[in-house]
Amino acid sequence: MFNDIPVFDYEDIQLIPNKCIITSRSQADTSVTLGKYQFKLPVIPANMQTIIDETIAEQLAKEGYFYIMHRFDEDSRKPFIKRMHEQGLIASISVGVKACEYEFVTSLKEDAPEFITIDIAHGHANSVIDMIKHIKTELPETFVIAGNVGTPEAVRELENAGADATKVGIGPGKVCITKVKTGFGTGGWQLAALRWCAKAARKPIIADGGIRTHGDIAKSIRFGASMVMIGSLFAGHFESPGKTVEVDGETFKEYYGSASEYQKGEHKNVEGKKILLPTKGHLSDTLTEMQQDLQSSISYAGGKDLDSLRHVDYVIVKNSIWNGDSI
């Protein structure tokens, strides 16, 4: 029964340290395997237009990080796959569920991407199940990520349809206002929703949304995530595609949600907003810091790799009064 599960979010949890068994944090292995491939970190920059573009995707792939290209420039996806493969890099793209996407997927048979993410706000839907089946029929070797969902029932249905991983999180992101506009979602209890969904999953879970600090990555892994999708922490870099804006001599980058009017181009069914983030240096610096912090997390967990994080104890401290958005 849902009402019987503990409800908490990232700021309500503290992980409990174990005896350290490594002599240097640099010995901690932060790598993760997804499908047939190994990546340096269990993090994914959100597949949003103000977070990732083709240049950043190439940079990430070359350096051994996982990425998911957004779906908002439909005509560029096929040339993008070709260009990545010509460089010996993996191709990871997004699709929606409109009728035209079925034809697009079929057209990829001659040069199939390694990863396809079905990317819609409410992923527990017949339209998503139908698209999973279509991709698996047309491109059986492609790894399919489906989402977004927020319940164990949704995870099981998408896995049963053929999804290789599911993305958990409805509305917890910094520029997502689904919870306010609709009354639905995992905002405010994203970590508990992740735990609930992961217990039902037989395949990898990707936690998506609500990450405000690097420590939240470790918490996500503790509660069942194989990988963590992050928006705001990856926004605002010099390389970020978001428009640069100057206010009182200080530079900012635009960051907006995929369901915002800025993305849609019209004020219809809006569930996202736009914010300005102070420009904060280079993406590579953030990735390095994330890795170092995660290595520290592994050392506190008393292990040598990410799996050690899954076995630590935790306490619920109920610091909900501390709003993660203020960090």
Curated annotation (Swiss-Prot):
Protein name listed in UniProt: GMP reductase
Catalytic activity: IMP + NH4(+) + NADP(+) = GMP + NADPH + 2 H(+)
Residues the record marks as active site: 176 (thioimidate intermediate)
Origin species: Streptococcus pyogenes serotype M1
Listed GO biological process terms: purine nucleotide metabolic process
Lineage: Bacteria, Bacillati, Bacillota, Bacilli, Lactobacillales
Family named by the database record: Belongs to the IMPDH/GMPR family. GuaC type 2 subfamily.
GO MF terms, alphabetically ordered: GMP reductase activity
UniProt cross-references to NCBIfam families, sorted A to Z: GMP_reduct_2 (TIGR01306), PRK05458.1 (NF003966)
